[in-house]
């Protein structure tokens, strides 16, 4: 499939536990084969020749029984009603197709010509193939998808450990004012890789339907706070700390290929940094967010006032107290929070 993201809504409609999936599985088990169009646009209806109009409520049993006839079945786009059965579809024969069987060739041409979802169930190969526009996708067995989802979760867990270690190292370097562009690029790159693995698992969850709840819970736990922290790191080091600019950089990186993402120098350039060994200073958004009960508005005021995390670390109680939204109690809490973090990372480094 060229673009899986375009199939998300389709996969939700066909997920295990849905009425449409139940009907498709029944046809597959019976080995009758079928051609089903999920869409009643004028473009689809113009291709219908013969058959008979039903316009009845959809049920898995009705779909299964109607599939015993040779012709195509036409459903409404929401798959709530069966419009036609035993129909012949006559798409433009000049539309190119890579398929060999008559049913699959017709399905691909109808999908390309109308842009609607067309489902072809093979009589011999036990396969359900989806076509939508130029895209093709073979619907996988539940057990296969679940196995792949669990494997991806294991990969995600291992990669998160590596990424968390890089983040901890960056935190220690920020407090000691020893950060290089390489340190930042490595964390930004690993965060993006982690989010990409998460996107892949989300696709599996969609395919699993109601059976994917456990996988979804594990994914949510593993990725909790990762995306938000990643944006804060970008705001800490990008040429400008505007949140929209950080989001735009994240989106730009999301469009890179895997090979492009491996180039740490390119990641550093995206952030506006120079050579990988060039020193950088954090603005402090991420580290200040770790201080308990410190509102986001106060963090914005701190960065606007001091500009760099090191200046916040060096600030006196009086200087902190002068910042809008910070009184003496909060100023002490900021100093104490930063002191504890410095001790924590120093201890972790010794271990």
From Swiss-Prot:
Enzyme Commission code(s) on record: 2.7.7.85
Keyword field: ATP-binding, DNA damage, DNA repair, DNA-binding, Magnesium, Nucleotide-binding, Nucleotidyltransferase, Transferase
Enzyme's top EC category: transferase
Cofactor: Mg(2+)
Domain DAC: 4-142
A Gene Ontology biological process term: DNA repair
Catalytic activity: 2 ATP = 3',3'-c-di-AMP + 2 diphosphate
Sites where the protein binds ATP: 71, 89, 102-106
PANTHER family xref list: DIADENYLATE CYCLASE (PTHR34185), DNA INTEGRITY SCANNING PROTEIN DISA (PTHR34185:SF3)
Quaternary structure note: Homooctamer.
Full protein name: DNA integrity scanning protein DisA
Protein's organism: Symbiobacterium thermophilum (strain DSM 24528 / JCM 14929 / IAM 14863 / T)
């Amino acid at each position: 499939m060229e673009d899986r993201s375009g199939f998300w809504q389709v996969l939700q409609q066909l997920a295990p536990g849905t009425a449409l999936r139940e009907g498709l599985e029944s046809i597959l088990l019976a080995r009758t084969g079928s051609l089903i169009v999920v869409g009643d646009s004028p473009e689809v209806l113009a291709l219908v020749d013969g058959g008979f109009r039903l316009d009845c409520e959809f049920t898995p049993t009705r779909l299964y029984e109607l599939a015993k006839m040779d012709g195509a079945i036409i459903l409404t786009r929401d798959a709530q009603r069966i419009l036609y059965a035993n129909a012949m579809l006559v798409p433009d024969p000049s539309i190119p197709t890579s398929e060999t069987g008559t049913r699959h060739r017709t399905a691909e041409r109808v999908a390309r010509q109308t842009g609607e979802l067309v489902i072809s169930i093979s009589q011999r190969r036990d396969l359900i193939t989806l076509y939508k526009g130029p895209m093709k996708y073979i619907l996988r067995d539940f057990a296969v998808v679940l196995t792949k989802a669990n494997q991806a979760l294991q990969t995600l867990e291992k990669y998160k450990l590596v990424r968390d270690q890089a983040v901890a190292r960056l935190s220690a370097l920020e407090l000691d004012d020893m950060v290089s562009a390489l340190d930042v690029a490595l964390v930004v790159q690993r965060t993006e890789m982690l989010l990409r693995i998460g996107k892949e698992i989300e696709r599996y969850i969609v395919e699993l339907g109601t059976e994917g709840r456990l996988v979804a819970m594990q994914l949510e736990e593993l990725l909790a706070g990762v995306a938000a922290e990643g944006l804060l790191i970008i705001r800490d080091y990008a040429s400008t700390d505007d949140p929209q600019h950080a989001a735009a950089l994240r989106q730009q990186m999301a469009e890179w290929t895997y090979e492009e993402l491996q180039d740490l120098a390119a990641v550093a350039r995206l952030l506006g940094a120079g050579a990988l060994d060039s020193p950088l200073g954090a603005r402090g958004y991420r580290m200040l967010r770790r201080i308990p009960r410190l509102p986001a508005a106060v963090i914005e005021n701190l960065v606007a006032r001091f500009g760099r995390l090191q200046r916040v670390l060096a600030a006196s109680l009086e200087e902190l107290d002068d910042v809008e939204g910070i009184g003496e109690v909060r100023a002490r809490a900021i100093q104490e929070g930063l002191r504890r973090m410095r001790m924590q990372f120093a201890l972790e480094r010794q271990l």
